[in-house]
Amino acid sequence: MTHFKWWQTAVFYQIYPRSFADGNGDGIGDLTGIMARLDYLKDLGVDALWLSPHYPSPQFDCGYDVADYTGVAPEYGTLDDFKRFLDGAHQRGLRVILDLVLNHTSDQHPWFVASRSSRDNPKRDWYIWRDGKPRGGPPNNWVSTFGGSAWEYDPAIGQYYYHYFFKQQPDLNWRNPAVQAAMFNAVRFWLDMGVDGFRLDAIGTLFEHPALPDSPAAPTPRDLFQAWHSGVTATEPAEVIEARLKAMFQYQVDQPGVHGVLRALRALVDEYDDRALVGETDDIAYHGNGNDELHLVFNFPLMRTRRLTPAWARANQAARLAALNAVTPFGAWPGNTLGNHDVPRVYSHFGDGDASRDDALARLSLALTLTLRGTPFLYNGEEIGMTDFMLADLRQFRDNLGVWACQAMIEFLHFAPEEALKQAAQRGRDKCRTPMQWADAPNAGFSPAGVETWLPVNPNYAQGVNVAGQLAQPASLLNFYRRLLRARRNSPALITGDYVPLHEDAPDYLAFLRRNAAQTCLVVLNFFERAHTVKFDLPTRAARLLFSSHERGADDLSRLSFAPFEIYIAELT
């Protein structure tokens, strides 16, 4: 009998610590605030927490520019606070994984400060330093994914250092064994403390082509921005844009050395009992043989559509599950998500501005995430229908990607400053990182009245988009989340069962079975605002209702009627 691990059966909940809960009243979320909300998370019905970066950082890239891998940012608390948070989570049966940024450090990390101090410093080779071309200019034509050259000149020493992201985030040299040893020591530090694993940020960027050849497809800054702009505005198919970007960065991402590091990291993690590695990638190759690299990679293709449809979901599942099975029938496992701290919020991304439809589509998106085969990942605030909030003043921006987008739209697309600001607010990531909305109270209950929060609070907390108000309403989105999470927890087939598609030509609804040795469940998701009557040719006509978004009577599987946007889950008997 197959034994499933906790990371296969869990529902993960991502906490963006700066925006989750302000425990000390300074306008910034912190560990004390998170600890005060652990009972809420337990009652919600999730099983594991993914904590976005909590390390000391200058915050140029919102914590993904790490200045100390074994510390806690002072605005979030202390190491003792972290230990109390971890203990509190474990006491409630909640696992905890940490974000781990392996590719680069902050330019203020002591390692880089030492590295740039002289060519003879022992840490010089911890980063990627090169001389420029004989006639001047950077070593090659590579670009940063955030625009401009990937090489930054240091006039004090007369060499360039490489950065795939912002120049404030110099890449580590993973070909240096001392770098791997130092980073693995940080991993051991947190594992020894008891964390349950890591989400590995930007894992495909650890290595570059060793010869540093010029890229034949290297874009100009304008080319890069236009490709990025096309992606976020959906003016071209996602696969077309992805192929173009892959060509642009062909020597900078997904190089062979990554697999060796992941195998070594997996061996380290496997020295500890029951820990997990999740990669910020959708590349199934990073499972290795299914048991020697990452435990989970994300099914990012699932979210790369403007509108969720049955055809999209079917095609995604067929492709992903077939690819996983090609690695190994059991060792690889899907990680399903529709939202995180880098992309539009689910309610805004899949909605169309009509309140009733948007609410129904938000419920369908959760149902899809929780009923497909794999481990679901939710993002804080999804459960109350938090929406993107567009900032109206560039001085409020905290995401430097948004600042770059504003400048690029003026320079490359010749937008007027007002239009560039509007577009940058939509393209940047601040919109999905605003403070969690806990109550219909000043600052949405995130911070005390009169405190300026690190990002502005979305004012729709006063229109019912808050935890306290929705807890008191049985039909609210929050209580829907709680009900559906409970239904999943009580249905073994929904957690570990196979996925069997049904009615594969149906344009308006998605139907499939989830089945294991203990149970077979029928799932029907009606994605459109019209009713349907459906006949199922199944071995049994009897079913026990497990969950429905609508009131229902007894069902005969030979002829089932579904209301507009209905979510239906039944156990075949």
Locate the predicted segments by residue.
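Acidic/aromatic-lined carbohydrate-recognition and catalytic surfaces
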Residues: 2-188, 192, 204-282, 436, ...
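Loop/helix patches that line or flank the sugar-binding groove of alpha-linked glycan CAZymes
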Residues: 6-8, 211-250, 260-272, 276, ...
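Short glycine-biased active-site loop of nucleotidyltransferases that positions the nucleotide triphosphate
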Residues: 59-63, 287-292, 513-514, 560
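Extended, hydrophobic alpha-helical segments in both membrane/secreted and soluble proteins
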Residues: 198-203, 365
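Beta-strand-rich binding/interaction modules
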Residues: 531-551
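C-terminal beta-strand-rich structural cap/linker in extracellular carbohydrate-active enzymes
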Residues: 556-573
